[in-house]
Structure formats: structure tokens, C-alpha cells
């Protein structure tokens, strides 16, 4: 009985790990598609830079330190610009 239970749990763990790895591989392949131009990524970066600059200006007018503000997606507001963290 114990051996059967251990075998079932082992198979379930392997299945979960395999599924997770397959999902990561699929996500990476979608990101690395040849047809996806770099201009789309540049547009996102420019949008984050703009959002951060506006946020910093609002905070400066309120006499707060701009460096405390964090941008979304791994970006940080520093010196009135968005920088990758």
C-alpha cells in the first residue's frame, strides 16, 4: 500500500514539474518570436519613462522625494527618470 502511494505521489510530482517547465518554455518561445519587432518593446519602455517622469514631477511639487516612487514592472523612479531595477 505504501509503495503504491509513494509511486502515485512521485508520478504526480513529476507531472507537475513537467507541466510547469512546458509552460515556461512556451512563454519563452512566444517572447522570442522572430516576428515580434523590438519597436513594441521600445514603446513600452518609453511609456514607462513618461509615466515615471510625470509621477516624479507630481511628487516634487508636493515636496516629497522622487526616489521613493517605484514604477511598475521592475522599474524604479530615480533622478526624474525610470531606471530598470
UniProtKB/Swiss-Prot annotation:
InterPro entries: Hwtx-2-like (IPR012625). Pfam families: Toxin_20. Residues 23-48 form a propeptide. It is found in: Secreted. Residues 1-22 form the signal peptide. GO terms for molecular function: toxin activity. Disulfide bonds join 52-66, 56-77, 71-82. The keyword Disulfide bond applies. Belongs to the neurotoxin 12 (Hwtx-2) family. 02 (Hwtx-2) subfamily. This is U4-theraphotoxin-Hhn1t. The lineage of its organism: Eukaryota, Metazoa, Ecdysozoa, Arthropoda, Chelicerata.
Amino acid at each position: 500500500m505504501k509503495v503504491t502511494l509513494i509511486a502515485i505521489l512521485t508520478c504526480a510530482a513529476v507531472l507537475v514539474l513537467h507541466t510547469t517547465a512546458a509552460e515556461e518554455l512556451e512563454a519563452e518561445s512566444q517572447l522570442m518570436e522572430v516576428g515580434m519587432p523590438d519597436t513594441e518593446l521600445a514603446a513600452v519602455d518609453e511609456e514607462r519613462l513618461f509615466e515615471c517622469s510625470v509621477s516624479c514631477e507630481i511628487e516634487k511639487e508636493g515636496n516629497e522625494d522622487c526616489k521613493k516612487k517605484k514604477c511598475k514592472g521592475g522599474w524604479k523612479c530615480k533622478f526624474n527618470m525610470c531606471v530598470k531595477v
